[in-house]
Amino acid sequence: MNIQKMMQDAQQMQEKLQRHMAEMRIEATAGGGTVYVTVTGNKQLISIRIDPAAKDDMEMLQDMIVAAINDAHRRVDEALAGQMQNMMGDMGLPR
């Protein structure tokens, strides 16, 4: 396989991965389901649901929102790492 072909294949796979990540939806919760967030594979926050009973403790609610978003971002990172390993395997590179 020549280098130019390998580079073209890598670019196509990267574009495919970017499209896949943009379409991906990752969900995470905090506080036993009190806060529920959804982010895209690009880490864009697209929804937050909060149990109305949580409004009585704003400081805790704020912490739960941050925790849920951070967990969602961690899950995106894990998904991306898995996708990258699959891509490397598809290209015949060591994982």
Regions found by a protein language model. Give the residues of each.
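Long amphipathic alpha-helical segments used for membrane anchoring, targeting, substrate engagement
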Residues: M1-E27, R74-R95
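Stable alpha-helical structural segments in soluble proteins, enriched in small hydrophobic residues
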Residues: M64, A68-V76
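Alpha-helix boundary/capping detector
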Residues: Y36-V39, K43, D71, M91, ...
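Residue-level signature of catalytic and energy-coupling elements of molecular machines
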Residues: A10, K43, I65
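N-terminal intrinsically disordered, cationic/polar leader segments
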Residues: E23-R25, T29-R49
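Short beta-strands and strand-coil junctions in structured, solvent-facing domains, enriched
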Residues: T34-Y36, K55, H73
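Residues at the start of alpha-helices and the adjacent loop-to-helix junctions
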Residues: M1-N2, M60, M64
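A short interface-forming secondary-structure element
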Residues: Q44-L61
